């Protein structure tokens, strides 16, 4: 992770140092080294490379920030529960009470005195028995 953060900065620093070396007032090069280096970048190429490096750095930084925001959004949903569940027994009790409440409010269970079909079946069974 640290490599991704430092590599664009390192490349940017190298490019700046190369450009600064070419702009020195008293160059270290001798007269024999006056021949142009085929691997040296022209000014236009250097600027394009610098712009591309800065663009890649900004894009990567934005991607990392978006990933961190998504992680914090996902954890913020459970943050209130995490604050409430500082004690394990409180957390377990809250979870069980929530599940118990959901169980009692679920109307799809087909048994008990509250079930409409059962009352009719019991009443018709009593009438048949007489």
UniProtKB/Swiss-Prot annotation:
Annotated InterPro entries: Calcitonin, Calcitonin-like, Calcitonin/adrenomedullin, Calcitonin_CS, Calcitonin_peptide-like
Propeptide: 26-82, 121-130
Sample GO molecular function, one term: hormone activity
Domain of life: Eukaryota
Keyword set includes Cell inner membrane: no
Keywords, sorted A to Z: Amidation, Cleavage on pair of basic residues, Disulfide bond, Hormone, Phosphoprotein, Secreted, Signal
Residues modified as Proline amide: 116
Signal sequence bounds: 1-25
Major site of localization recorded for this protein: secreted
GO cellular component, one term: extracellular region
Region named Disordered: 62-84
Modification Phosphoserine occurs at: 42
Cellular location(s): Secreted
SS bond list: 85-91
Tissue specificity of this protein: Synthesized by C-cells of the thyroid gland.
Role of this protein: Calcitonin is a peptide hormone that causes a rapid but short-lived drop in the level of calcium and phosphate in blood by promoting the incorporation of those ions in the bones. Calcitonin function is mediated by the calcitonin receptor/CALCR and the CALCR-RAMP2 (AMYR2) receptor complex.
Family: Belongs to the calcitonin family.
Name this protein carries in UniProt: Calcitonin
């Amino acid at each position: 992770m640290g490599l991704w953060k430092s590599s664009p900065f390192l490349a940017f620093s190298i490019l700046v140092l190369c450009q600064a070396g070419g702009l020195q007032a008293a160059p270290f090069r001798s007269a024999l080294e006056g021949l142009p280096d085929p691997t040296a970048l022209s000014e236009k190429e250097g600027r394009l490379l610098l712009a591309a490096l800065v663009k890649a750095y900004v894009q990567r930084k934005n991607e990392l920030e978006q990933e961190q925001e998504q992680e914090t959004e996902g954890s913020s949903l459970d943050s209130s529960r995490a604050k409430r569940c500082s004690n394990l027994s409180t957390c377990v009790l809250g979870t069980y009470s929530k599940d118990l409440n959901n169980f009692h409010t679920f109307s799809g269970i087909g048994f008990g005195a509250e079930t409409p079909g059962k009352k009719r079946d019991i009443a018709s069974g009593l009438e048949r028995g007489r």
